[in-house]
From Swiss-Prot:
It holds the Pfam family eIF-6. This is Translation initiation factor 6. It comes from Methanococcus maripaludis (strain C5 / ATCC BAA-1333). PANTHER family: TRANSLATION INITIATION FACTOR 6. Keywords: Initiation factor, Protein biosynthesis. One of its GO terms (biological process) is cytosolic ribosome assembly. GO terms for molecular function: ribosome binding; translation initiation factor activity. Transmembrane segments: none annotated.
Length: 227
């Protein structure tokens, strides 16, 4: 199932939220009706919060069913809220505050529960990232861009990436993430940073409200969401 929506008129949902196979984090500005619809589509428990006193949740943190990486500028109150949410939902998730010069972990890491791709900008933290997310990784860029997280969206079945990703890079991504499908595409009527526009897991996807019909078909194909 795929749902189209906006967050207070904004269609870059992936910048402001995070969804995994088992949990989700959304900005405080999202109304309760939209929250419930997204939770139903993705079939996950979710909560609303800030990261580092910011609504840029998806840009600043990255996670999968095994772990969650947040920047060290995340406040103690925010960390406690995350811990409480995980405990209330019986989720065994490694939570790590990582100190790095570039704190946009969501923009620089693309992960699912099988593997992760780490931007060269975070290569020195490879071991920590692998340990927290409990996956093997590959370090590198694709489409000549270091922002491997914001330019891709991955589930345990498939992955959609920037349209300029070449064939060798597609094979590399597929091998690391161990998915059946890797496709090139866009969202929100031509936006190439698909990770900034889409939230997805194997059960469903939430896409920016500007996403066209043909783009939705490509998203469904790449993420194996076609019934």
């Amino acid at each position: 199932m795929i749902m189209k929506t906006y967050f207070s008129g904004v269609s870059t949902l992936g910048v402001h939220s995070l969804a995994t196979e088992d949990y989700g984090f959304f900005p405080l500005s999202v109304d309760q009706k939209t929250m419930e619809r997204m939770k139903n589509v993705l079939d996950i428990p979710a909560t609303q919060l800030n990261i580092s006193n910011s609504s840029l949740i998806g840009s600043l943190c990255v996670g999968n069913s095994n772990g969650l990486l947040v920047p060290d500028i995340t406040t103690e109150k925010e960390v406690e809220l995350i811990k409480m949410f995980l405990k209330e939902n019986s989720l065994d998730v490694n939570l790590e505050r990582l100190k790095a010069k570039n704190t946009a972990f969501g923009n620089l890491i693309l992960t699912n529960n099988k593997g992760c791709i780490i931007s060269e900008e975070l290569s020195r933290f490879r071991k920590t990232i692998e340990d927290v997310l409990d996956v093997e990784s590959g370090v590198g860029n694709y489409a000549e861009l270091p922002t491997v997280g914001s330019n891709g969206v991955a589930t345990d079945k498939g992955c959609l990436v920037h349209p300029l990703t070449d064939e060798l890079e597609l094979e590399w991504i597929q091998d690391i993430l161990r998915v059946d499908y890797v496709e090139r595409g866009t969202a929100n009527r031509g936006v190439t940073s698909v990770g900034a526009c889409i939230l997805a897991n194997i059960k469903g996807a939430v896409v920016g409200g500007d996403t066209s019909g043909p783009e939705i078909l490509k998203i469904e194909e790449a993420l194996d969401l076609i019934d």
